[in-house]
């Protein structure tokens, strides 16, 4: 029989307590494993995209449902409701298509991607205080001096070597009692004003008291995790829960996009009402110690896509990595049945931009290849527990309007395996262009839960993601591209950053019934390094154990393109007896792939006459040289990518045989010969 997908709202997050505490029934029927194959024939492509409206249509912004106040004026928020429900992401198809084949993973070419300074370290995990929920909603951002990681429900600050500097649970961070559930975090670095920005949600699922929390650091130092170090505000959004809030900014505004659900009657499954875009003016100074209450702008209910007919869903503001004055917002037309009765193939991205005056404009849609909501991902060991791959929505966007805005989503691919489609969009005012598009796929694995970011120098991008299959526990992996990479592609190969040690089977997998996909994600992070401008940093999750208790763990990492080293410099030689000692200085190179060996060549005139290879070092001795012959030397550095150019020649040296000094025998002591005494004269007569 044909699959039926029941309407249900997005969820914020689930905590272990929900498994044991009574509450209203969870929504049902969204992921029937038996329905997956029957659903496949419904994946028809649209014959033609709808006509786009005139570009740059101003959007009204009177926010009757939003009011912003300092977080200190909220009083103490109550304990969050215990009603379990799921995000729209759980609409992911639960079944594994019968057309899928399983075979060993095909080896790829040696990857050009590498770790910056070897940085790939564990971050937050489900066992730490405040992190008992699932999924983690892993996110993070890099600044000049720190990497900041956020998960449900904690924040951690690291130095640029990923050593922990400070950590706090969200309730401590914003000054609320222990146990208040704050979730769906977002964190970004604002390079225009040298400060940090955040957004998160008060996850109150039981009544009409709803809050969206936003704020910024008072200085460029994020490590004081309280109101002493941060300006913190809360938008009263009663009665609407602003689910799946996504953060972005330009040089003037903090921008949040989200989906509104009416929480007036918590005894029912509240319906989706509208998407919303909210913006808060940022102080001009990068040192805001007064924390004056800002104004707030927001779209009215009923925000539509560029076709001016269908409701928008999950608008994603761009994390602008420059001083651009226009702040863009992108959204994929809903393929998951969140705003319609059933999942529907889509082929458009909606775009808005907020100008420097705080006016939001509806830009023309961007046509893209038709995409369909993905199937859920299987795991090793043939467990019934599949992994939620979300519902085709965009989850993050990073970049600059001129050099490129990068975004991505998980959609259905060949063999009904999920794939990640990424987009590069350029924009100027209301004019937007799809500059590039590509897909991350695997012949055997499901690929999902991705994040993409350009490099700060705009000379490439990195994408990280999860993948799993019936033969693979979930892994975190990444790929990279540079300016010369062909359109629509990444450089060959991938870098595996972390591998799960077991399949995920936590309490979310059986709520409301066995076979419902395990909550995974719901998103991950990628951001450009403003200091080491060819590096992209990220965070994503993997799993450490099976069982009903969440066992997710975050991995934080820094990625760059591995290149052959530059030529060594300052090559010098000193002659010996039939030998020469050669020294050199390793030249600067991308620290992701240091030299592992050096090749030395001896020259007589312009002709190479001998070579030798040594392990990584800064000196070596060339032996078996001919005395009396003049030599010069060059050095080549070698790493896994390849050799460097040859260095310049050293100074000329001439080995000579050590002079043999003839030391005379020590003098022997001697005396003049003793002559016999003359005979006495004969006696006289």
Name what the model sees in each region.
Residues 597-600:
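Short beta-strand elements bearing conserved aromatic residues within extracellular beta-rich modules
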Residues 11-22:
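Bacterial N-terminal signal peptides
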Residues 1-8:
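N-terminal secretory signal peptides that target proteins for export/translocation
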């Amino acid at each position: 029989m044909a699959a039926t997908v029941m309407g249900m709202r997005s969820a914020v997050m689930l905590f272990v307590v929900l498994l044991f505490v009574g509450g209203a029934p969870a929504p049902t029927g969204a992921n029937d494993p038996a329905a997956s194959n029957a659903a496949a024939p419904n994946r028809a492509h649209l014959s033609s995209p709808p006509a786009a409206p005139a570009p740059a249509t101003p959007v009204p912004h009177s926010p009757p449902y939003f009011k912003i106040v300092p977080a200190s004026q909220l009083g103490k928020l109550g304990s969050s409701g215990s009603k379990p429900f799921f995000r729209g992401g759980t609409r992911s198809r639960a079944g594994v298509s019968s057309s899928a084949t399983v075979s060993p993973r095909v080896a790829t070419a040696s990857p050009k991607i590498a770790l910056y300074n070897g940085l790939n370290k564990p971050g937050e995990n489900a066992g730490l205080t405040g992190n008992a929920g699932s999924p983690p909603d892993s996110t993070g951002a890099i600044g000049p001096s720190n990497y900041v990681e956020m998960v449900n429900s904690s924040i951690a600050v690291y130095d640029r070597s990923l050593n922990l500097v400070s950590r706090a649970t969200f309730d401590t961070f914003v000054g609320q009692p222990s146990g208040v559930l704050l979730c769906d975090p977002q964190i970004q670095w604002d390079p225009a004003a040298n400060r940090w920005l955040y957004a998160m949600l008060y996850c109150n699922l039981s009544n009409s008291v709803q809050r969206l929390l936003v704020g910024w650091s008072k200085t460029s130092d994020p490590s004081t995790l309280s109101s002493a170090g941060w300006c913190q505000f809360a938008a009263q959004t009663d009665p609407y829960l602003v689910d799946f809030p996504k953060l972005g900014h330009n040089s003037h505004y903090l921008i949040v996009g989200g989906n509104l659900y009416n929480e007036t009657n918590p005894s029912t499954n509240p319906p989706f009402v509208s998407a919303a875009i909210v913006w808060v003016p940022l102080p001009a100074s990068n040192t805001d110690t007064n924390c004056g209450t800002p104004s707030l702008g927001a779209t009215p209910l009923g925000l539509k896509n560029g076709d001016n007919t269908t409701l928008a869903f999950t608008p994603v503001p761009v994390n602008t990595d420059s001083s651009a004055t226009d702040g863009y917002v992108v959204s994929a037309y809903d393929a998951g049945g969140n705003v319609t009765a059933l999942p529907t193939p889509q082929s458009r991205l909606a775009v808005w931009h907020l100008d420097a005056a705080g006016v939001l404009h509806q830009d023309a849609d961007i046509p893209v290849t038709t995409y369909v909501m993905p199937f859920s991902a299987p795991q090793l060991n043939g467990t019934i527990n599949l992994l939620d791959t979300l519902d085709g929505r965009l989850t993050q966007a990073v970049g600059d309007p001129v050099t490129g805005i990068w975004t991505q989503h998980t959609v259905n691919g060949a063999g009904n395996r999920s794939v990640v489609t990424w987009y590069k969009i350029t924009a100027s005012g209301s004019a937007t262009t799809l500059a590039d598009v590509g897909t991350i796929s695997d012949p055997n694995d499901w690929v999902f839960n991705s994040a993409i970011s350009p490099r700060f120098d705009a000379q490439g991008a990195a994408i990280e993601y999860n993948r799993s299959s019936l033969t693979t526990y979930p892994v975190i992996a990444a790929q990279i591209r540079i300016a010369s990479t062909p359109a629509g592609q990444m450089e060959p190969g991938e870098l595996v950053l972390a591998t799960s040690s077991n399949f995920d089977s936590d309490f979310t997998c059986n709520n409301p019934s066995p076979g419902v996909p395990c909550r995974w994600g719901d998103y991950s992070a990628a951001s450009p390094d403003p200091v080491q401008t060819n590096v992209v940093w990220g965070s994503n999750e993997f799993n450490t154990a099976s069982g009903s208790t969440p066992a997710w763990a975050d991995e934080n990492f820094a990625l760059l393109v591995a290149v052959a080293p530059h030529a060594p410099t300052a090559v010098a030689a000193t002659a010996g007896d039939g030998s020469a000692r050669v020294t050199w200085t390793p030249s600067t190179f991308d620290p992701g792939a240091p030299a592992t060996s050096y090749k030395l060549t001896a020259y007589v005139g312009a002709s190479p006459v001998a070579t030798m290879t040594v392990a990584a070092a800064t000196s070596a001795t060339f032996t078996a040289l001919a005395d009396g012959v003049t030599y010069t030397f060059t050095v080549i550095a070698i790493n896994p990518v390849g050799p460097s150019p040859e260095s310049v020649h050293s100074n000329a040296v001439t080995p000579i045989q050590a002079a043999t000094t003839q030391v005379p025998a020590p003098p022997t002591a001697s005396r003049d010969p003793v002559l016999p005494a003359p005979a006495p004269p004969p006696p006289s007569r």
